[in-house]
A protein has these predicted regions:
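Non-catalytic cap/lid and distal C-terminal segments of serine-dependent acyl enzymes
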Residues: 2-148
């Protein structure tokens, strides 16, 4: 039997993070958490537009508390360093949490068999086209209207 880990909420001690719990998708017929990182100085200059970077497996990008096996990518820390060094334009970063048991279905473009974590034989349904529609037609318009 496959084991699926439920991801905890990110810690609330980071004012740069905005969590959208159970963001609903019509295309995927499910919900997932979305975390948005706002760069230093966000909102200080009226009308300023920021580039947006979207990350899959979004529970991993900022907080070890929510990251798979506690290994966060620390994307906010790295972006802040690069912004302060004037090496990048300050982006808004969006972490799209995976749904655990549905992860491979959503990322795979075609049905396929693969070995699960415990060696169990698994099969993906190949829902990448629907996942792309979720990103482009549902999530991006939400991010654009709320953060840009």
């Amino acid at each position: 039997m496959a084991v699926h880990r439920i991801m905890p909420r990110p810690r609330k001690n980071n004012p740069a993070l905005r969590l959208h719990r159970r963001f609903r998708s019509h295309w995927l017929r499910n919900s997932r958490d979305i975390v948005v990182w706002l760069p230093p100085g966000y909102g200080l200059v009226r009308g300023r537009r920021h580039p947006v970077v979207y990350f899959q497996d979004g529970q991993n990008i900022f907080d070890p508390h929510t990251a798979f096996l506690g290994n966060a990518w620390h994307a906010g820390d790295r972006a802040t360093e690069l912004i302060r060094a004037h090496r990048i334009v300050a982006p808004v970063m969006v972490g799209v949490y995976n749904t655990g048991f549905n992860r491979m279905n959503e990322y795979a473009p075609t049905p396929a068999e693969f070995a699960g974590w415990d060696g169990e034989k698994c099969r993906s349904t190949g829902d990448a086209k629907r996942y792309a529609k979720f990103l482009v037609q549902e999530l991006k318009p939400f991010i654009d209207s709320h953060y840009l």
